[in-house]
C-alpha cells in the first residue's frame, strides 16, 4: 500500500471519528453512569477501559483509543471471537497487555470516554468493522487506517 493511500486513509479516519457529540461531563459522572452510557456492566467497562489505557501506552489520541475500544467491541459481536469482553480480552495470543499484566493500570477519563464513544459509534451501526490492530503493519484483513502508531484492519 502506498504512503499516499495510508495518509488518505488516516485523514479520513481522523475526520470520521471526530464527528462525535460533545464530551461527556466526567466530573459529574460515576463509574456506574459511565458503564451505563457504554451499555456495559461496571466490571466490563473497567476492564475494557483499563486495557485501552494500557494498549494506548498512555499517549494516544482519543481517536486511537476509540479504535482500540472498537476493536474489542467488534470482536465480541463477531462469530470468530469469544462472546464477552472478558473472554475477548483474555483470549490466548491477543492483547499482550492483559497477558503480561500491564493492563492493571489506572483508567483515565480519556480512556473511559473512548470506550463510551466506541460503544455509541458501534450502536449507531456505521462504525468500521475493525477487528485487529498492531504497530508493525497491515498483516491481516483489509487496511482501515493508521492512527497514533497503530495499523487498524477490518476483517
What do these predicted ranges mean?
Residues 1-39:
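Cell-wall glycan-active module
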Residues 25-155:
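Bacterial extracytoplasmic/cell-wall-associated proteins, especially those involved in peptidoglycan
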